């Protein structure tokens, strides 16, 4: 054990009450973490809906029902299309954001041609798989520092920032999404 681990061990085993408290906390920590994450993404969804209602009602906000699914997302779709949109993906893990399309529903050769033609005009341009625009947000809700950002006293403000970031990406690149929908769907 490291010196730090030895101190933790000594502190937690110094009395039955301390050990019991640590044990109770460790048994409930995952539930607390899950609630923090769910509450945060529901706040992002709420903030996105506010932005859509105030600024561009052509977008539709969709938050996956299972935030802990590996490819879970919080998306901005254009009108009723749900085959391509602006998305935060991996909501409970290593998050990314960008302009995404559902691969089997699109003509990839048309998308590849469009990517090459528009690469200097697309924010965070990408040729990565099902992404036209891609950015790793460097946030992972399996990490302590990222979880600190969504504690109740910070969650609403941070949700506004996350919503604003996705909304701005969507507004800046709306023409590219519209092109995909109108020209590349199979």
Residue spans for each PLM region:
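Contiguous mid-protein beta-loop-alpha structural module that forms a pocket-lining wall or clamp
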Residues: 1-11
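C-terminal amphipathic "assembly/sorting" segment characterized by alternating charged
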Residues: 117-186
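Polyanion-binding interface signature
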Residues: 10-146
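Short, solvent-exposed helix-helix connector turns and helix-capping sites enriched
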Residues: 4, 15-19, 151
């Amino acid at each position: 054990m490291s010196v730090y681990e030895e101190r933790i061990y000594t502190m937690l085993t110094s009395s039955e009450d301390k050990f019991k408290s640590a044990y109770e906390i460790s048994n409930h920590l995952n539930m607390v973490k899950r609630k923090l994450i769910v509450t945060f993404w529901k706040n992002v969804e709420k903030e996105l809906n506010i932005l859509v209602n105030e600024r561009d009602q052509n977008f539709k906000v969709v938050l996956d029902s299972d935030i802990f699914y590996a490819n879970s997302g919080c998306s901005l779709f254009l009108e009723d299309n749900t085959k391509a949109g602006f998305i935060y993906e991996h909501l409970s893990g290593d998050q990314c954001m960008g302009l995404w399309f559902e691969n089997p529903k699109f003509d990839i050769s048309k998308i590849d041609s469009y990517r090459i033609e528009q690469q200097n005009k697309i924010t965070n341009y990408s040729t990565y798989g099902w992404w036209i625009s891609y950015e790793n947000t460097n946030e992972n809700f399996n990490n302590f520092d990222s979880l600190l950002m969504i504690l109740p006293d910070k969650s609403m403000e941070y949700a506004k920032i996350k919503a604003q970031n996705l909304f701005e990406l969507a507004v800046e690149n709306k023409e590219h999404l519209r092109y995909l929908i109108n020209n590349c769907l199979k």
